């Protein structure tokens, strides 16, 4: 019986940023991971060699550009270049977490770069034929690329876990800030039009602590905070305190990308947050894996099905409408 690899000449390669995720994707697809050397020379420069024939193959390279962002981005670029020079049919950059995505505009016309566009231009210029990513920080970032972008959503995975772990009785979806209202509303709608609350953060004047106003009734309810990424977790933990002070019985958070930099794990351990559920778009640190409040879901099946649909020329948008 022919496999997907036999039928479509499909191959999956990995950088070093998240090999366990790549291995899980390959298992879901029923293909083996492509053979390659991805290392560094003694002076720190990237060293890449594709160790098998890829001529006329449809290749997918899995590499999130998480920390160390510059190294992982450069690694992705040189892998793509090596594959293009080896005469592949096409290369899809599978970037589960697109680093630099928060640097997507010039705030107040400051003299700063739009680094998300710089990274997108580099990936386009090196020869990637398309990009597959999950939950971009802003959908408009797709326009920074000069190649097609499939931005799929982790919400089906997160929603299924919410249904399974918490049900919908006495549940309310909470946006941690005004900017996340669209995402939170979409999640609430998928949970049977459950209630929605918004946290409005305001600093009354300079040197005065930020005040968190809760828009919505959370008293006696299980609050589900939703967002695309968690970094130091300061805002998330402050939101949990505000919700508990307003009578919430339980506060959990469902967030796609676990950046978890700096004091994030300590903040979560010492917070009012009951549980933080994340995905494996970014590998967890040892400290995060040992944290009893953090639970991780896998996007491997989601990405594998998307890769399969791309390889067979099937619709992706019909599967991941959000």
Curated annotation (Swiss-Prot):
Name the reaction it catalyses.
D-ribose 5-phosphate + ATP = 5-phospho-alpha-D-ribose 1-diphosphate + AMP + H(+)
What the entry lists under SUPFAM superfamilies is as follows: PRTase-like
Instruction: Write down how the cofactor binds this protein.
Output: Binds 2 Mg(2+) ions per subunit.
Q: Name the InterPro entries for this protein.
A: PRib_PP_synth_CS, Pribosyltran_N, PRibTrfase_dom, PRTase-like, Rib-P_diPkinase, Rib-P_diPkinase_bac
A GO CC term assigned to this protein in UniProt: cytoplasm
Q: What is its EC number?
A: 2.7.6.1
Q: Name one GO biological process term.
A: purine nucleotide biosynthetic process
Show the GO MF annotations: ATP binding; kinase activity; magnesium ion binding; ribose phosphate diphosphokinase activity
Amino-acid positions noted as binding D-ribose 5-phosphate in the UniProt annotation, renumbered to this chain = 203, 227, 231-235
Detail which positions bind Mg(2+) 2. 177
Q: In which pathway does it act?
A: Metabolic intermediate biosynthesis; 5-phospho-alpha-D-ribose 1-diphosphate biosynthesis; 5-phospho-alpha-D-ribose 1-diphosphate from D-ribose 5-phosphate (route I): step 1/1
Where ATP binds, per the record, is at 43-45, 102-103
NCBIfam families in alphabetical order: PRK01259.1 (NF002320), PRK04923.1 (NF003428), ribP_PPkin (TIGR01251)
Task: Please identify the protein, giving its name as recorded.
Answer: Ribose-phosphate pyrophosphokinase
Q: Which organism is it from?
A: Xylella fastidiosa (strain 9a5c)
């Amino acid at each position: 019986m022919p496999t997907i690899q036999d039928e479509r000449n499909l191959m999956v390669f990995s950088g070093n940023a998240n090999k366990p995720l790549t291995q899980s994707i390959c298992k879901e697809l029923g293909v083996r991971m492509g053979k390659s050397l991805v290392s560094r020379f003694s002076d720190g420069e990237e060293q890449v060699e594709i160790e098998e024939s890829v001529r006329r193959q449809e290749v997918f390279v899995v590499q999130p550009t998480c920390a160390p962002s510059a190294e992982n981005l450069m690694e992705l670029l040189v892998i793509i270049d090596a594959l293009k020079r080896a005469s592949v049919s096409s290369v899809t950059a599978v970037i589960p977490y697109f680093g630099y995505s928060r640097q997507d505009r010039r705030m107040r016309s400051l003299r700063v770069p739009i680094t998300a566009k710089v990274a997108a231009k580099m990936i386009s210029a090196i020869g990637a034929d398309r990009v597959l990513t999950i939950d971009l920080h802003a959908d408009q970032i797709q326009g920074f690329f000069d190649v097609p972008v499939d931005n799929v959503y982790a919400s089906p995975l997160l929603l299924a876990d919410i249904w399974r772990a918490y049900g919908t009785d006495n549940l309310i979806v909470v946006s941690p800030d005004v900017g996340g209202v669209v995402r939170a509303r979409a999640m609430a709608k998928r949970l049977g039009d459950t209630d929605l609350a918004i946290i409005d953060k305001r600093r009354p004047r300079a040197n005065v602590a930020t005040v968190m106003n809760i828009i919505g009734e959370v008293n006696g309810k299980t609050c589900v905070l939703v967002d695309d990424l968690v970094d130091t977790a300061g805002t998330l933990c402050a939101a949990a305190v505000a919700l508990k002070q307003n009578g919430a019985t339980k506060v959990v958070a469902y967030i796609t990308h676990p950046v978890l930099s700096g004091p994030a794990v300590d903040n979560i351990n010492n917070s009012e947050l009951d549980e933080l559920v994340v995905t494996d778009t970014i590998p967890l640190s040892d400290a995060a894996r040992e944290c009893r409040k953090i639970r991780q879901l896998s996007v491997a099946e989601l990405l594998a099905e998307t890769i399969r649909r791309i390889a067979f020329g099937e619709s992706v948008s019909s599967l991941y409408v959000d």
